[in-house]
C-alpha cells in the first residue's frame, strides 16, 4: 500500500514529475521525496479509502504507517515497533530472496554481521527480536543494542552495494523511471482519462490526483498502460480500463 510501481525508483520518478509540474527544481535535495510511499500509505487510509471517508484507524496505526521507513521518528511505541520491524523484515527477506534467485550464498554475507545476527534468517530474526525485547525493557523505549543495530546496518549496507545497486534490477531502473514520468505526463494532460475515484479530492491539484492513480498501479499494470499509450497497435481498443 502506497508503494509505487517498480519500488523506490518509481517514488523518485513521481517526486521528479511533481516537482517539474509545480515549477520546482527536481534536483534540489529537499524536493527528492515530495512523493514518499510512507506518506502516501497514510494518505490512502486517512483520505482515499471508502470514497474519501478513510478507514478510521487509530493514531498509533497511522503513526506506524507514516513512520515505518525513512528518518521520521514515530511518536508512539507502536509506531516505533513497526519501524524497527520493517528494517528487520526487508534485510532478512531480501537475503532469502537473493539466495533463492542464486544471486548470493550465506558465506558471502559479511562475517562480522553474521557473528552477531546469526547464520540463517530464522536465527537472525529470533536474535534481533530477543535483542529488541531485552534492550527496550532496559531503556524504556523501543530500541536495539548498539552492537545488534550496527550488525544489521552492516548487512543492509552489504545488500545495497552488492544487490540493490547492481544486477538486472539496477539495469532496468532508468527504463522504469522513464515509464513513470511518461505516465504522469500523459495523465496530467488528459485528466478525463484518470478514473473517477481519484478525482474526488484535491480539485486544484491535478498532479496529486495523477500521483494517486499512478502510484496505485502494479508494475505489470503500469507497463500495460504505457504500452497502450505509447506503442502502436493494429486496430482494436485500449486494453486498460479506467
Name every feature range the model reports, one short phrase each.
Residues 1-31, 38:
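Aspartate-rich (DDxxD/NDxxD/DxxxD) Mg2+/diphosphate-binding motifs
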Residues 22, 34-242:
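Histidine-centered, transition-metal-coordinating active-site segments
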Amino acid at each position: 500500500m502506497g508503494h509505487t510501481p517498480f519500488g523506490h525508483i518509481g517514488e523518485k520518478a513521481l517526486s521528479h514529475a511533481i516537482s517539474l509540474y509545480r515549477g520546482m527544481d527536481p534536483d534540489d535535495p529537499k524536493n527528492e521525496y515530495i512523493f514518499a510511499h510512507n506518506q502516501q500509505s497514510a494518505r490512502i487510509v486517512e483520505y482515499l479509502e471508502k470514497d474519501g471517508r478513510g478507514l478510521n484507524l487509530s493514531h498509533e496505526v497511522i503513526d506506524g504507517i507514516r513512520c515505518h521507513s525513512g528518518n521520521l521518528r514515530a511518536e508512539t511505541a507502536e509506531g516505533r515497533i513497526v519501524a524497527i520491524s520493517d528494517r528487520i523484515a526487508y534485510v532478512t527477506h531480501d537475503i532469502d530472496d537473493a539466495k533463492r534467485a542464486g544471486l548470493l550464498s550465506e558465506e558471502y554475507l559479511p562475517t562480522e554481521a553474521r557473528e552477531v545476527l546469526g547464520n540463517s534468517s530464522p536465527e537472525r530474526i529470533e536474535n534481533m527480536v530477543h535483542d529488541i525485547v531485552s534492550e527496550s525493557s532496559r531503556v524504556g523505549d523501543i530500541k536495539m543494542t548498539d552492537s545488534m543495530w550496527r550488525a544489521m546496518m552492516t548487512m543492509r549496507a552489504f545488500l545495497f552495494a552488492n544487490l540493490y545497486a547492481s544486477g538486472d534490477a539496477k539495469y532496468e531502473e532508468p527504463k522504469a523511471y522513464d515509464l513513470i514520468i511518461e505516465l504522469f505526463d500523459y495523465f496530467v494532460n488528459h485528466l478525463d482519462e484518470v478514473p473517477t475515484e481519484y478525482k474526488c479530492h484535491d480539485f486544484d491539484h491535478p498532479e496529486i490526483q495523477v500521483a494517486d492513480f499512478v502510484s496505485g498501479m502494479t508494475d505489470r499494470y503500469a507497463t500495460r498502460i504505457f504500452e497502450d499509450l505509447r506503442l502502436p497497435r493494429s486496430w482494436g481498443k485500449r486494453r486498460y480500463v479506467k
